[in-house]
Swiss-Prot record:
InterPro entries noted in UniProt: G-protein_beta_WD-40_rep, Sec13/Seh1_fam, WD40/YVTN_repeat-like_dom_sf, WD40_repeat_dom_sf, WD40_rpt
UniProt cross-references to SMART domains, sorted A to Z: WD40
Protein name in the entry: Protein transport protein SEC13
Alphabetical list of SUPFAM superfamilies matching this protein: WD40 repeat-like (SSF50978)
Keyword Endoplasmic reticulum on entry: yes
Gene this protein is translated from: SEC13
């Protein structure tokens, strides 16, 4: 049963909402420059905190894995990425939130932030309209960063690959280790895959996926590691492309195109990685699944 929060407390449009790992907290962000934290219990919800610090619309919020603590990242039109942490205080006062890191090296809107799989550490990728991607990492009690050019006309989205290689779980041969890799979508209509080189400690493009004829608004890497790699990309050209790569030929990516009646804003995989949710400018959400023949079929429409 869906729970609807009708009175969000925000004074303007809400751009993103995200639940924590346990599904007990909900963070929302808005053009009113604030972030709201709700506590969820059964069918009820309670506003427990309003976080203020951004100087522009807040586009994105993302919870870190709980093994790093109660940490939330936010990104804004103001060009900043803020890292927030909840700290327990005296029993009588409960807990309090504080800003633990400000990252302000981007020169334009930061459109999306995405945490890496927790196996890779406390690592955050940030996509900006200045054409750059930054990667922040918390190690040894301090934050470090890398920033590099990614797309000529701006970066709209970023999504991490699973830490394990596809097929490694069911393979008879041992895995070669964890992979640090992500995908970006840009205003240059391109989807790019970035690989980390542990020797040079830098990221470089390993694949450029072409096919969209409009801005790529969102990308999402499937969390499934059972067989193949799947990346979904959503575009202003009214299509979603599902890019597939097989472990037997990891350098080849093929795509399947889904067509829609409106601009497509967001794509999101289920936790198991086998169902794709698509939302667009027509205020509809549809769910898609691959059949046994390798074709993608719509299994449900969700309309308010």
């Amino acid at each position: 049963m869906a729970q609807v929060i009708t009175n969000s407390g925000h004074d303007d449009m809400i751009h993103d909402a995200g639940m924590d790992y346990y599904g007990r907290r909900l963070a929302t962000c808005s053009s009113d420059k604030t972030i709201k934290i709700f506590e969820l219990e059964g069918d009820s919800h309670r506003l427990i905190e309003t976080l203020k610090g951004h100087e522009g619309a807040v586009w994105c919020v993302a919870w870190a894995h709980p093994k790093f603590g109660t940490i939330l990242a936010s990104s804004s039109y103001d060009g900043k990425v803020l890292i927030w942490r909840e700290q327990s205080s005296a029993a009588s006062t409960g807990s309090s939130w504080s800003r633990v890191f400000d990252f302000s090296l981007h020169t334009a809107s930061v459109n999306m932030v995405s945490w890496a799989p927790h196996e890779l550490g406390c690592v955050l990728a940030c996509a900006s309209s200045d054409g750059h991607v930054s990667v922040l990492e918390f190690r040894d009690n301090s934050w470090t960063h890398q920033i590099f050019h990614a797309h000529g006309m701006g970066v709209n989205s970023v999504s991490w690959a699973p830490a394990a290689a596809p097929g490694s779980v069911i393979s008879a041969t041992p895995s070669t280790g964890q992979i640090r890799r992500f995908v970006t979508g840009g205003s240059d209509n391109l989807v790019k895959i970035w690989d980390y080189n542990p020797e040079t400690k830098t990221y470089a493009t390993s694949h450029v996926l072409e096919g969209h004829t409009g801005w790529v608004r969102d990308v999402s890497w499937s969390p499934s590691i059972l067989s193949r790699s799947y990346i979904a990309s959503a575009s202003q050209d009214k299509t979603v492309r599902i890019w597939t790569s097989d472990p037997s030929n990891p350098n080849e990516w093929t795509s399947h195109q889904l067509e829609f009646d409106a601009v497509v804003w967001r794509v999101s995989w289920s936790l198991s990685g086998n169902i794709l949710a698509v939302s667009g400018g027509d205020n509809k959400v549809s769910l898609w699944k691959e059949n046994l023949k390798g074709q993608w079929e719509k299994v449900k429409d969700i309309e308010e």
